[in-house]
Amino acid sequence: MASFPCPIEETLLPVPCKVNLRLAVGARRPNGYHDIDTFFLPLPEPADVLRLRRFDGPGDIDLQCSDPELETDDNLVVRAYRAYAAATGYAPRLEVHLAKHIPHGAGLGGGSSDAAVMLRYLNDRADEAALSPVDLAALALTLGADIPFFLLGVPAVATGVGETLIPADPGLAGWCAVVVCPEARVKTAWAYAALDASRALPQKPGANLLTTAFDANKRAFCVTGAPMRNDFESVVFAAHPELGRVKERLLALGAAGALLSGTGSAVFGLFRKRQTATLALAMLTGSGPRAYLAPL
């Protein structure tokens, strides 16, 4: 009878997502990246789950995923593993199952967060080959601009292409976020190209950054002194008007502020009271799109 090796360790790790409380996009750099000024907020829901089985001796990574289309060498989990192995020489034999719950193409950073969890897992077990936090963040940046934030794991203001991080308190303790994930998918490259193209056109005066229901006096909901803002809303909502309607719906249901996350398609609302957020969640899920409640 054939015998099968037993893992020396089996680990189950949650993978959080993020939203952007602010996302201002600057000029395009020669390397294709854009300067940004953003406020990242990690959320516990929706969340992926990584199950890792580590075997004795060196090897490679075998990835299985609840979405078979993501079982490729281009998956950021695989790329993170191989980048870490190339940088440190630490390459344990791993069987990885990725339970995918963070929607792809939603602006919630699911793939980047998956990669950050893999990098942290490897670094915690690499002993003398382990990288310093600075070197680990530098390696993460080669894989994706927001992966260093997920390594940091706390609310932070990010500038540059996202690599310069300053931990910050958004002042939302006790609040709840409701994250709505419509079926639409927005490609990041398209969103940046569309934004660049729109800026080449004559601009209308008085761009409206209002994110609250206070239309009468134009009071903008603020987080640490800056209005909630996402420069991508103009182009993304024009291409996907249903996403703009989700934002309006969140505000109508009592959100103090609402915004597109990243390049979309997810839209989130911030609620002062859990009861109001729970009711909004029930109303939204009854109308179709997936929605999640995340305590802050």
Curated annotation (Swiss-Prot):
ATP binds at P103, H104, G105, A106, G107, L108, G109, G110, G111, S112, S113. One of its GO terms (biological process) is terpenoid biosynthetic process. Its EC number is 2.7.1.148. The keyword Phosphoprotein does not apply. GO terms for molecular function: 4-(cytidine 5'-diphospho)-2-C-methyl-D-erythritol kinase activity; ATP binding. It catalyses: 4-CDP-2-C-methyl-D-erythritol + ATP = 4-CDP-2-C-methyl-D-erythritol 2-phosphate + ADP + H(+). Transmembrane segments: none annotated. Keywords: ATP-binding, Isoprene biosynthesis, Kinase, Nucleotide-binding, Transferase. The active site is at K18, D146. Pathway: Isoprenoid biosynthesis; isopentenyl diphosphate biosynthesis via DXP pathway; isopentenyl diphosphate from 1-deoxy-D-xylulose 5-phosphate: step 3/6. Belongs to the GHMP kinase family. IspE subfamily. NCBIfam families: ispE (TIGR00154). Catalyzes the phosphorylation of the position 2 hydroxy group of 4-diphosphocytidyl-2C-methyl-D-erythritol. This is 4-diphosphocytidyl-2-C-methyl-D-erythritol kinase. It comes from Solidesulfovibrio magneticus (strain ATCC 700980 / DSM 13731 / RS-1).
